[in-house]
């Protein structure tokens, strides 16, 4: 009896230990989410729903298109191309040599205001056939150098405009080197129209991308000179022409803000523009234009958005009417088994 009891005790202890071991399994924890068993709604695109969807889209998009188009048409815009007219007739056979010469390049232009323009009137320069999105051009800069004076020697990404005589260029790179340098001054009836150049750049760029203690060094001291110069006594965060230029454009035709005229211009006014035709667009067959423009709640003049809304809305409305006519003329019962392939006649046989 004692041996039996002992063996029973040992056996009992063993089974207790085995039952205490936690069983492991590679089976993932059950969840209705992971097993895709959550309740779901699966809408069926019935003819009525399709017609209603297209109808609603057309009714919404067409008025939006009309509103956007009216807003765009309300913008008054004057565009004056001057790159060819500002070259003397005797130099038009070799415009590159003229623009690279040392002579004075003052040009006088006259602009007539055809429709009243309420202030502020935005002054833009427009360049065409200028690829600021070229990979080599875009990479030729150092954003860290623009923010901190500690990074002024980090110019390895700025070649070929990285240093002059071993000294770093600040700001370095082709983007800064090619800074636009045509200048404009305006007058009306012999009275000067002041151009406000404060606040023409993005506030986020001024505060975050250009340092308040970073000053130009050795800029445009090499050869050849690419574009405009900078004031060495002003930090980069205050040189807004540079900040505007450094925000590169995605397309070869682009506008950049030059300044704002804080005076109303009346219909029939004659604006005299004295400009310095300095920037070389002739080497790459580019164009230069001066643009005066007002704005609307939608921005500058751009008919594309309104036309796009009208086009899409008209297509949706046309499809809604077409489907409605087809549904009324030749209705089809939803889920009709006679339309199944095995229920259709093949070659006239059932």
Swiss-Prot record:
Tissues/organs with expression: Expressed in roots, leaves, stems, flowers and siliques.
Compartments it resides in: Golgi apparatus membrane; Prevacuolar compartment membrane; Endoplasmic reticulum membrane
Segments for region (Disordered): 1-23
Primary location recorded for the protein, binned into one broad class: Golgi
Transmembrane regions listed in the UniProt entry: 50-70, 304-324
Summary of the function given for this chain in its UniProt record: Required for the lipid transport activity of the ALA/ALIS P4-ATPase complex.
Protein family (similarity comment): Belongs to the CDC50/LEM3 family.
Annotated protein name in UniProt: ALA-interacting subunit 5
Originating organism: Arabidopsis thaliana (Mouse-ear cress)
């Amino acid at each position: 009896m004692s041996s039996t009891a002992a063996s029973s005790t040992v056996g009992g202890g063993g089974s207790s230990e085995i039952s205490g071991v936690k069983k492991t399994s590679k089976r993932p924890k059950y969840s209705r989410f992971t097993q895709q068993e959550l309740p779901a709604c699966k809408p069926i695109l019935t003819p009525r729903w399709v017609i209603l969807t297209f109808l609603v889209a057309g009714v919404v998009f067409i008025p939006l298109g009309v509103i956007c188009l009216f807003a765009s048409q309300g913008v008054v815009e004057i565009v004056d191309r001057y790159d060819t007219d500002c070259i003397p007739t005797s130099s038009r056979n070799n415009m590159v040599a003229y623009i690279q010469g040392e002579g004075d390049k003052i040009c006088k232009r006259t602009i007539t205001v055809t429709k009243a323009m309420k202030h502020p009137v935005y002054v833009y320069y427009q360049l065409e056939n200028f690829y600021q999105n070229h990979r080599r051009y875009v990479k030729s800069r150092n954003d860290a150098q623009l923010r901190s004076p500690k990074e002024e020697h980090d110019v390895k990404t700025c070649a070929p405009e990285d240093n002059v005589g071993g000294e770093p260029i600040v700001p370095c790179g082709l983007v800064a080197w090619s800074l636009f340098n045509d200048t404009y001054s305006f007058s009306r009836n012999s009275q000067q129209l002041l151009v406000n150049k404060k606040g023409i750049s993005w506030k986020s760029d001024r505060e975050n991308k250009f340092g308040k203690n970073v000053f130009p060094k050795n800029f445009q001291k090499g050869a050849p000179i690419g574009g405009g110069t900078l004031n060495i006594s002003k930090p980069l965060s205050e040189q807004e022409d540079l900040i505007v230029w450094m925000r590169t454009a995605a397309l070869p035709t682009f506008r950049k803000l030059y300044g704002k005229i804080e005076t109303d211009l009346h219909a029939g006014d004659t604006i005299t523009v004295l400009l310095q035709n300095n920037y070389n667009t002739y080497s790459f067959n580019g164009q230069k234009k001066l643009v005066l423009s007002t704005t609307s709640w939608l921005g500058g003049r751009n008919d594309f958005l309104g036309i796009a809304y009208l086009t899409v809305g008209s297509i949706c409305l046309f499809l809604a009417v077409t489907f409605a006519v087809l549904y009324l003329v030749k209705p089809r019962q939803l889920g009709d088994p006679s339309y199944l392939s095995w229920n259709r006649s093949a070659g006239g046989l059932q």
